[in-house]
Amino acid sequence: MNNFSIISGYKPAGDQPKAIDEIITGLNSKKRSQMLLGITGSGKTFTMANIIERTNRPTLIMAHNKTLAAQIYLEMKSIFPKNAVEYFVSYYDYYQPESYIVRTDTFIEKDSSINEQIDLMRHSATRSLLERRDVIVISSVSCIYGLGAPDLYYQMTVHLEPGQNYPRDKLLNDLINLQYKRNDIGFERGCFRVKGDNMDIFPSHYSDKAWRLSFFGDELEYIHEFDPLTGEKLTQLDKAMIFGNSHFVMPRERINHAISSIEVELQKRLEFLKSQDKLIEAKRLNQRTLYDLEMLTETGSCKGIENYSRFFTGRNAGQPPPTLFEYLPEDALLFIDESHVSVPQIRAMYNSDRARKEVLVEHGFRLPSALDNRPLKFEEWEKFRPQTVFVSATPGQFELEETGGTVVELIIRPTGLLDPECIIKPATNQVEDLISEIQTTINTGLRILVTTLTKKMAEDLTSYLQDLQYKTYYLHSNIHTLERIEILRNLRQGTIDILVGINLLREGIDIPECGLVAILDADKEGFLRSETSLIQTIGRAARNSRGKVILYADKMTKSIDKAVSETLRRRQIQQEYNKKHGIIPKTINRAIHALESLEEIHDNKLDKKQANALLNNPAKLKAHMDKLKKEMFKAASNLEFEQAAKLRNQLKALEEAALKLS
């Protein structure tokens, strides 16, 4: 069994050793819930990594969005290069759910665009959980949504070993049951091809490796791994396991049983609708369901098959659907990052999904069983979650209640950095005073973040500062993903000095060069000026030893009082620690590499404008990547390996950029 092994030039420092020991003690004493209160820059990810290494338990880390999940994934992958670090988020680049608008009698078909790279990573995650224990899965809230049952998924795997008797026709049939497609021309993930005594399989969990099976009659002589692009043999395998090309693969007898159950439910529902004199709804439901049943009978699948998932998994009405949590071993560990956001998000998922589907069922677009194709209810998630460590700088009410108000604090930063000084100034002449503070900060070579309450004020302030010849930019939700990252990069490099926004704490702003955070109208109580929001915003200035925060307010609100008092408490603890240990605070010097993958795109002859257009249009991106794949394989078949390698690099750069920006 592989053990977790951290590969890093750093050792736990500051509050980290104490926090690691306390959390592990709690885990060993069977505490179900613990709270790790980690401030900005305290090394929460590294602390989690050390807890994982010392407990040596399979781990799921939940984040509240894809961007944060991707950041944690990249960090954990660099810390644990020898272990299985996996990424499990929604594989939709674009998703329009099936819905019906009663007021206008409008039915909207489900429309989606699947990201092949993320689909591959989801398969890799479930495979790792079934095959090994040294696994860390970083996931979004996608992990509480229905997935194929793990027992069926594992039951359908094909086990292969050299010397084994495995009739080739049976293997072909088994691969088709696993939803692999035969394609002797375009060899890609989820496909297989046959040539003479050889069969090539491109597993669903790989992007750059395939397997070649060589037969002598019905005997499997050998299996070797090869590069599907160049055909180069990589290594010989003593065994191979082929998992389904979908998490919803199932034996034919299970499909037949499901079809019978669907037919029974259809008849009951039709009788009910007719008894209510809903003849149009009954006719609509009958036509739609019979078409799906015909497709299931002939092909084993149909559009919207997930709406019948209850019958395929063998669950009863109302029972929770199988999710990623059922793939976790009993002794797994769960971290919930930014729990003050993640927990309410988990709580909200079920109700929003239920409301939409009830309308579809009521108006004859779906059978009532479609209601069981859903995310977990909060109470169900509570039951399924293993030992949990909530992680946040601003814990929510649920986490504090679960842990009895006991928190393990990460307040001392390894760099010795202090929480920023907070200054409260009158809001009456806030813009005039802000300009004076901006000039002082710019003179020291640092950057400024300004947060406003409204979009109009942000726009007006940006224009005003630009008229005064300050290098200012307004960061808002309509900015394209590529442009947003370039703006942040320009801010760090000094091309921009001032960034204005409404909710900067939500934008993932992490700028070591930030010397001033200005919060305008800080005394206007509400979501954007709550205690949690203020503490999170104040934390944006905690990456620089000269960072400070100015709150413009004409009155002291409860939120300001609590946020400033908490920041001062932490600052005093940090100052005492630094004085005791002779530590001088050092600004974090982090390399500017956010656009690395995008620069690789440009190096491969894809201009900036084209990259921006592609990354913000999933359909165009997929079409362009499909075109690149075809050109790549064509170049390889013509033995033009240099050209094929260039195309492969461009394709990989696009995939990585899309992942980072998703």
Curated annotation (Swiss-Prot):
Residues 430-592 form the Helicase C-terminal domain. It is found in: Cytoplasm. A motif (Beta-hairpin) lies at residues 91-114. The keyword ATP-binding applies. The keyword ATP-binding applies. SUPFAM superfamilies: C-terminal UvrC-binding domain of UvrB, P-loop containing nucleoside triphosphate hydrolases. GO terms for cellular component: cytoplasm; excinuclease repair complex. Keywords: ATP-binding, Cytoplasm, DNA damage, DNA excision, DNA repair, Excision nuclease, Nucleotide-binding, SOS response. It comes from the Bacteria. Residues 622-657 form the UVR domain. ATP binds at residues 38-45. Residues 25-414 form the Helicase ATP-binding domain. GO terms for molecular function: ATP binding; ATP hydrolysis activity; DNA binding; excinuclease ABC activity. Belongs to the UvrB family. The UvrABC repair system catalyzes the recognition and processing of DNA lesions. A damage recognition complex composed of 2 UvrA and 2 UvrB subunits scans DNA for abnormalities. Upon binding of the UvrA(2)B(2) complex to a putative damaged site, the DNA wraps around one UvrB monomer. DNA wrap is dependent on ATP binding by UvrB and probably causes local melting of the DNA helix, facilitating insertion of UvrB beta-hairpin between the DNA strands. Then UvrB probes one DNA strand for the presence of a lesion. Forms a heterotetramer with UvrA during the search for lesions. Interacts with UvrC in an incision complex. This is UvrABC system protein B. It comes from Rickettsia prowazekii (strain Madrid E). The gene is uvrB.
